[in-house]
Amino acid sequence: MKGSCLCSAVAYEVSRPAAGLHIGLCSCRSCRKAHAAPFNVYASVPRENFRWLRGEDKTRIYESSPGKNRHFCSVCGSQLVAEYPGESNLLLRVALLDEDPGARPVEHIFRSQQVPWCDWESDAIARYEEWGPSGEPTARNTQ
């Protein structure tokens, strides 16, 4: 599987672990702030399954909490991976994959830190398939 940042300056490849891809959601404050989102979608992958294809020199590291390094693109700011140095796995940012990972989330951690305003399953939220060129939503999905 290949992934890239928003500006495409950084790209990577990751092979599926033999045991399958373990995907989770994290609602901790650190992930919410780092990703400017109500949660982060991650996959734990062995380091040996990951390699940079281009732009590794454009990555920067931020230690967001003691011992946790977040790697991001210095051009566009996209979060790429996180790691605890010395551990055998990396935390891949699933939303940056350029294809369907073929697995779905199996856990949601730090639910105690969820934001109260984000209930994307609520029937009160209108759903649209895309955003049109005129700046209007297109093809409302009522499901």
Could you say what each language-model-derived stretch is?
Residues M1-Q143:
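A short Gly-Trp-Pro
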